[in-house]
Amino acid sequence: MVENGLIGRINWQNLFKIAIFFGLLFLMVAPATAWEWTAHKKIVDEININLPSDVQKNLKPYLAVMKEGSTYPDTLPNDKINHGYPGSYSQTNTWLDNGKVAYEKGDYREAAWCFGVASHYITDTYSAPHCGWIKDKEKYWQIGNQLSPKKHDFHYSNLNNMLQYGNERGKESIA
């Protein structure tokens, strides 16, 4: 195993920080893009820009793969329950773990795919349609286009708490 770059720094705490980053990034980007596939792809662009330079270098050739992964869960039949908490928690863990293993093996294409899929489940957890299963998503998207993004500085003890918090905030936004 190589002990430099991301691999030397990667541990569960770092993966958790990456997951938090995905979540916080969503809070800044999502209202302006209003939950179409373009939102997931824009989030991937922001993630790529903010990665450590060595990781960015390794994953950049596979940015399109990461974007494709970020929309993949929406193509899965019968996966709706996993787009909101608590289903998103197990999916996020699975895809982050798979991405970590692929990255450590040097399979950056697979890592990019996995991290893209994980980003989808994290960001959907914060989306009101996935928290309350509102029926009029078009109205939600129209309202979302009128919102101004805000950056939040939250601290979580673990990924589960972060996703639970996102789910609660999403439900509040449709109340």
Each language-model region and where it sits:
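N-terminal secretory signal peptides that target proteins for export/translocation
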Residues: 1-13
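Bacterial N-terminal signal peptides
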Residues: 17-28
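N-terminal, motif-rich segments that launch catalysis or mediate targeting to/interaction with membranes
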Residues: 30-117, 128-175
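Short active-site segment of divalent metal-dependent hydrolases/proteases
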Residues: 123-127
